Amino acid sequence: MVRTEDACGIIKCALQNDIKVYLDGGWGVDALLGRESRIHNDIDLFVELKHYRDYIHVIKQHGFREMTTDYTTDGHTIWKDDKQRIIDLHCFEFTNDGIVYEGDIFPSETFSGIGKVGDITVSCIDPLSQVMVHLGYEHDENDMHDVMLLCETFQIAVPDEYKEK
């Protein structure tokens, strides 16, 4: 489980080493909201390719070990420590065409969100993009919770697949 104090510590590991991180997933949503709205089993972080290996070195020094899963790739790795805190780490690159992640190109504005975790101001996926990345798959109760809070807070139309049937 990754609570606010854990998320702050993980983020500070990057910032203290001049590595900028961008939040996604549940913590990305909660950063936009400025509060912890639910329990998180992990923290999703995006790190630029030029800092990816450096950040891995840093988190290893803080006791995180890589876990191999069926969805890990060279640019998407999972890290866990003895306190059962999990970092879902993604590597991306800024290009003239936008943000390149796993061969896909996203608009440069995707990381234009600004939020807060504890007392740390963080960059994250903007609210509309957060809602959009929650589409097209079978969502769970956390997805429902996150999307509904984003739509309510930022006056975004609730997507059809999230409307009560």
Q: What are these language model-derived features?
A:
Residues 54-61:
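Short, well-structured hydrophobic secondary-structure segments
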Residues 1-23, 148, 155-165:
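Helical scaffold of the NTase/Pol beta-like nucleotidyltransferase catalytic core
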Residues 61-71, 114, 158-160:
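Short secondary-structure junctions
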Residues 101-165:
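Catalytic cores of NTP-dependent nucleotidyl/adenyl transfer enzymes across multiple folds
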Residues 15, 60, 116:
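Anion (oxyanion) recognition and catalysis
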Residues 64-98:
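Conserved catalytic core of two-metal-ion nucleotidyltransferases
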Residues 11-43, 48-49, 54, 126:
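Active-site nucleotide-donor binding segment shared across nucleotidyl transfer reactions
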Residues 28-29, 94-95, 129-131:
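Short, solvent-exposed loop/turn segments at secondary-structure junctions
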